[in-house]
Amino acid sequence: MPIRQMKDSSETHLVIKTQPLKHHNPKTVQNGKIPPPSPSPVTVTTPATVTQSQASSPSPPSKNRSRRRNRGGRKSDQGDVCMRPSSRPRKPPPPSQTTSSAVSVATAGEIVAVNHQMQMGVRKNSNFAPRPGFGTLGTKCIVKANHFLADLPTKDLNQYDVTITPEVSSKSVNRAIIAELVRLYKESDLGRRLPAYDGRKSLYTAGELPFTWKEFSVKIVDEDDGIINGPKRERSYKVAIKFVARANMHHLGEFLAGKRADCPQEAVQILDIVLRELSVKRFCPVGRSFFSPDIKTPQRLGEGLESWCGFYQSIRPTQMGLSLNIDMASAAFIEPLPVIEFVAQLLGKDVLSKPLSDSDRVKIKKGLRGVKVEVTHRANVRRKYRVAGLTTQPTRELMFPVDENCTMKSVIEYFQEMYGFTIQHTHLPCLQVGNQKKASYLPMEACKIVEGQRYTKRLNEKQITALLKVTCQRPRDRENDILRTVQHNAYDQDPYAKEFGMNISEKLASVEARILPAPWLKYHENGKEKDCLPQVGQWNMMNKKMINGMTVSRWACVNFSRSVQENVARGFCNELGQMCEVSGMEFNPEPVIPIYSARPDQVEKALKHVYHTSMNKTKGKELELLLAILPDNNGSLYGDLKRICETELGLISQCCLTKHVFKISKQYLANVSLKINVKMGGRNTVLVDAISCRIPLVSDIPTIIFGADVTHPENGEESSPSIAAVVASQDWPEVTKYAGLVCAQAHRQELIQDLYKTWQDPVRGTVSGGMIRDLLISFRKATGQKPLRIIFYRDGVSEGQFYQVLLYELDAIRKACASLEPNYQPPVTFIVVQKRHHTRLFANNHRDKNSTDRSGNILPGTVVDTKICHPTEFDFYLCSHAGIQGTSRPAHYHVLWDENNFTADGIQSLTNNLCYTYARCTRSVSIVPPAYYAHLAAFRARFYLEPEIMQDNGSPGKKNTKTTTVGDVGVKPLPALKENVKRVMFYC
């Protein structure tokens, strides 16, 4: 467990110097608060030994190697980024020798000893925005949350460093070693303590062990030797245990009570490990979740995969005290099948009678590489191996040397002579195990896949659909499963929970919530309905016209679907044009050129033909819109089309799938017309409060709202860059139109590198640029005013990255503003938006139809800022959308920085109201639109990476050209968006 270095006088601090606003707008006095001061740029105080250049250009924090949600795998849910003690502890003193009582400040990652009383570090004093109070707006109600109150231990917890020799990389082997050590020595040398272990370097006890350092000898059975009946091989290990630090429970108690702002994060992490200890032994751990085929019957996902059900578990500090967050989870696992059966499922064909093609071999190799198998051809031995590859030759042709004289023997002969095993399917290749220098061959029919291996590669569309069916649970069913899980885990009988003095409630937390009112939406005066009040998060376009409908005079259509005849395509385009007209646009019924049919593999040729032919027809006037009809399964076609249109030709495009062309739905056409209008630069609707200037801390002075996100490559793409996207509102006071910019950056880099940048120009000298600066300039061009307030919604940041993201990106915002004019420092509010969390809110009474929507979920607008939220910081949960199926996931908003002095009601209402302005549908959405748009833009930009190999599901895959290596700063930039594309919401 990481131990933090104590702060000394040379530590870097964040210092914000404020200065009074020289010019006030009287409207800035909102919510009973004075106008916020306009701060000067962030200044970083550094030790005297740091040079001026180092101080002015701090290098960004190191990249986070973890993965994101739909953007990757697990991230840290709690705590700050911290350093682990050296894996090689200093040689312990002899038992008779005492340590000096003087204070010694160690180097980073080492231990600070103060009179033998070693205390665990706390989170960096980040000075995140404190909670300004609790919200009062809305209709009060009670909801239940999947949080279970946990008692705080009364004893201080002790941490010990564990060194196992020889070193072991496997957590499961480490755990087996420590389990055997506890079995042997608990009653004697361990003083009857039952320690909890993290599987790596740290051991924890409630109370001290009878020593500060001790070495033990342990022998454990080698499970991988595979012997079933008979003596098993034993391995011997030395285990050194050394006292490291103590976690102060009183400090944690004060933090939970709101009396201290600094969280003793290691103490929380220890308690998390304690409550996981028994589950680690019972189930298959994956990140913070646990899975088992015994919880529910596994469901087949196809191609040799199955779903396992499980549960997520995490201890969290909240206002009500320590809270155990329990949620249901599902994951894809490799079915424990005979390898031949797995291969047949993977390929979807009989492999025993039909020969394998080269593409079959590639697919088998990808599917089995890294998978653990056990042999079945030996009666009493089930030895396990990890697959390294596949032989290029069939089994019948495989020969290998059996002695130093290179005497060759066939694999068939070897297995017959050694094991009496006759290989039946000699046309199949063998599995290759071991390393390349000393490879071993195993016939497929002699191997079975080991149970409990999680599948970490990308799922195809069918597998995703099948997995979603398993995970999609109605709220009442999910709540019942969570309660059953808590009862099954029986924390009251958990020996580790008892040892550490932790009692867990078996009741869901009952939480006070409020339902915020939906905002009034403004539509065009020419419509029958000029404004609208959404009902339960929904409304429609009947009798309404877009508030700013655009004109489409010059358009064309390309048909890439063989099954769509020209007359069908023409009829669809007519229907779509009429819907645009009904919705408030002007749409020319005739295309510039007749509908052009093309093959999907000739997308570039077709698009350029349509572009140039149209230009000739219109005498140089460019197309305003390109409609494209695509096959339902279109592979790379969609991405190629978007890349060519947006980065080469400067065309705004709208794609439609064949199934929608044949089965025309009014609802579908209405939604497509909404997308077309904003892509053309229009607005569909705006908040009534926005145009009447009644939004606190937005309507009073020119305000720009940003959204930012970073998406990472899928598993297995170890060299593809991450994509960052930033969008910003371009209209005020409406705050509805958002321009977007994208950039590629180093693999898995979470901090957005291009927010602000400078470079040297031979003529102009130092030149400033970056996405923030460019969007501030475009706001001024669009509105005629410079922004005097910034609201920044940042998506996709885990709690462990809060500090470094705020430090780095707030500094970039400051520098971007200062580069535009001296002393230009508008106040900033920086809010992190999180959807990848496991808090779920349930109606207090599922039978009360007035407290739920049609899906059984809590009502849209439900906000919670008490009990399950942070003890002192400014955060809240908001369920802003109506559920469709499954259990709604509320978004979690954490205000890290607030120079605009928002009240709780102010930021909660603004966020909820913005969720009704999402351009692509007539529903409120689950996260604030600027963050949503940034995610869409980042996802779109991944198609710009060329050349790409598209996977079966149409998502960008690995590059087939030389790519940037991990950590390389020289990432190849994305092709630039054309200027006319940048100005509009092209990503919608």
From Swiss-Prot:
Give the Basic and acidic residues compositional bias ranges: 1-11
- Annotated region Disordered: the residues are 1-103
The Piwi domain covers 625-946
Tissue specificity, please? Expressed in roots, stems, leaves, developing embryo, siliques, inflorescences, provascular tissue, shoot apical meristem (SAM) and adaxial (upper) sides of lateral organ primordia. Observed in the floral meristem, the adaxial side of sepal primordia, and the provascular tissue.
Which CDD domains does its entry note?
PAZ_argonaute_like, Piwi_ago-like
Q: Which GO terms describe its molecular function?
A: miRNA binding
Task: Please note every region of biased composition (Low complexity).
Answer: 41-57
Q: What is this protein called?
A: Protein argonaute 10
Originating gene: AGO10
Does the record bear Ribonucleoprotein in its keywords? Answer: yes
Basic residues: which segments have biased composition? 64-73
Q: What happens when the gene is disrupted?
A: Defects in meristem formation. Shoot apical meristem (SAM) terminates to a flat meristem, a small radially symmetric pin-like structure that lacks a vascular strand, a radially symmetric leaf, a single leaf or two leaves fused on their adaxial sides. Abnormal ovules and embryos. The double mutant pnh-2 han-2 has smaller inflorescence meristems (IM) and taller floral meristems (FM) leading to fewer petals.
Listed GO biological process terms: defense response to virus; miRNA metabolic process; primary shoot apical meristem specification; regulation of meristem structural organization; regulation of shoot apical meristem development; regulation of translation; regulatory ncRNA-mediated gene silencing; somatic stem cell population maintenance
Family according to the record:
Belongs to the argonaute family. Ago subfamily.
Domain PAZ: start-end pairs:
338-451
Instruction: Read off the InterPro entries from this record.
Output: ArgoL1, ArgoL2, Argonaute_Mid_dom, Argonaute_N, PAZ_dom, PAZ_dom_sf, Piwi, Piwi_ago-like
